[in-house]
Every structure is written in structure tokens, then in C-alpha cells.
């Protein structure tokens, strides 16, 4: 019915907190069993959530943190450039709250990632990952419904990343 209740907020909070606790335990267990660096990854969609999660992940023992900043905005009134500014704002906030290296994974939905990559480095990121692999839907024509697309990567998935890595390699510090 479109109504959002306090009960729904509680359930969402409880579910997220439980999943985060599982993830933090996984980091702790991995650190206890491995001698190689552990790079944790988080994907949030609100600016405020990143810093809380990042600090907890650092405290769990992660050696570095990947920020998977991927969302698709289809709003007509979304201001041009706001998506890129969100990346910078998230990096600034996270860098204030952790001392471990921070890496940013970008989505493919950028017109020109090179200026953003330069700005991310200027704000102290240790690296950039090109690109996030998007979940692809498909359509079941017999049932006329959406279904999950291919979940596995293919060699052709690399071409766009390789192109942008080549273009950025001599333009990014």
C-alpha cells in the first residue's frame, strides 16, 4: 500500500546489522587464517552509512577497504554532476574515519571517468577499480516477466575496462 512504518525500519535495521556482523566476523576469521592482506569491500547508497561501516570494517582487521560506489539514477531532475560529487563526498567522509588504504570501484555509467579518477586520487584514494560488473536482467518471453540474466563473467566483459585503463593510464597520477 506504499506506507512505510517504524516496524519496517526496525526490520531493515535488524537485517542490515545482522549481515554486517556476519561480514565483520568473516573479516576477523580471514585475518586469523591468512597471511596476505585482507581487502574488504562495502556497497552503500547513502553518504551517512559509509563512514560507520568503514570504521567497523577497519576495527575488524581489514588491511584496506574498497568502496563499491554503484547506483543507477533514473530521475529526470537529478542534477548533472551530482553522481560524481557523491563519489568525492563519500571518499572525504570515509578517509576522515579510517586510516587504512581506500580504493574506489567505479560503475560503467560515467560519461568520462578520467576527471573523476583524478579527483579521487587528489582526495587520497590508494587506487581505483574499473569497473563494477552490473547485474543484468533478462526477459522470459514465455511468461513475459523479468528473470535474472547471466550471472557469470565473460572475457568480453573486460574490453571496456581495458579501454578506459588505457585511456586513463597516462592522464592519472
Language-model segments: what does each one mean?
Residues 8-16:
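Acidic/glycine-enriched edge-of-secondary-structure segments
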Residues 1-6, 18-28, 32-39, 43-173:
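Alpha/beta enzyme core
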